[in-house]
Amino acid sequence: MMRSLYSGVSGLQNHQTRMDVVGNNIANVNTIGFKKGRVNFQDMISQSISVASRPTDARGGTNPKQVGLGMNVASIDTIHTQGAFQSTQKASDLGVSGNGFFILKEGKNLFYTRAGAFDVDSDRHLVNPANGMRIQGWMARDLEGEKVINTASDIEDLIIPIGDKEGAKSTKNVTFACNLDKRLPLIQEGASPADIARGTWVVNKSLYDSFGNVSVLELRVVKDLNTPNLWNATVLINGEQNSNFTLGFDNEGALASLNGQPGQKGDILQIPITFNVLGANVGEVGEQQTVNLKLGTVGSYTDSITQFADSSSTKAIIQDGYGMGYMENYEIDQNGVIVGIYSNGIRRDLGKIALASFMNPGGLAKSGDTNFVETSNSGQVRIGETGLAGLGDIRSGVLEMANVDLAEQFTDMIVTQRGFQANAKTITTSDQLLQELVRLKN
């Protein structure tokens, strides 16, 4: 009879544990990155009254007689299903769409989390502002004048250098991929200024030297009076004539020749121009600068000047220089690349956020602050970039909500409550039976 008392006690204790887990799930229903827990029960050892016997010629076999001695908690699992995303419109708020974890560092210790409410501290580190832990990834490094992110190197603290300067870069090339309207009228001798304006295609482009001084390129193009599909171009720098050249097109509107020299299909037609850069002071003449005008590829319509009966365009004209600028803002793309946005219009890759994965994420241990730590049963951490081995993508401007389903938790709460009540009834009923035994003495 005493066994039923202890079975009831084990039921009370373990249903209380289950209620604790359910209560914690409900408490964290609005905790970003939280992963719900689940309690599984199993029965305890059973006491054997008699063992099983095998069949004989005279009798059949018998089954064992066993009395269970209660139950205990088999496991308390952490369920790592994807939570829904909540939009925040804040660039440093991040969520993972996939199985990866953000990596945080405190001293020499690494922690892993799905809670991506990050910010930039006074030292310009990307951190979790709740505890100061630093987000890990890879910073871009200078390689032959270009910023390169080496994801094969060790992870490090990520720095977002708000306010840093980006030096000026001199213009080396001006690339044209615009259209000259074949319908433009010819400019006859003695034409009026209005007729000249109607028959001239004009484009202006700012050019930069290594100090950020600006010179203005003006290109004026008119139809040749005598030769079909031929255009005469004049280059002006800062209002002064610099050079002249001619452009020829085939009968299908594609670029064909430069200065009367026909090119082979696929040839790039370009012409250098040299000029004196305007200095910073009025009247000051700077050093000479040479800029290459890339007019296009012979026979190409996509990356060349063309001649079609459509409006002349100036949109597809690009120069590769810029003045000095300051980093004003940043954004993070779905690959985890942190892109700096500068006041001079330049965008620079600053670094990349690393993600971690585990063979058995259920083996991770919760360490507080919605963080996890590696254990002997989680498997060793595997660190990589987004998109690899199921790590998933990074979403900027969102936070992952808890994966707690309140309807499920309330149902589990009711079942747990009834289980607790039933075990309590087992104890009170066993107590009544003991009282009957005591009364037999009287």
State the predicted function of each range.
Residues N423:
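Acidic/polar, glycine-anchored loop/turn motif associated with catalytic or activation segments
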Residues T426, S430-L434:
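Short segments within alpha-helical structural elements
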Residues M2, K35, V39-N403, E408-D412, ...:
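Small/polar low-complexity and glycine-rich loop motifs
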Residues S10-T17, I32, M401, T411-I414, ...:
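Alpha-helix capping and helix-loop boundary segments enriched in small/acidic/polar residues
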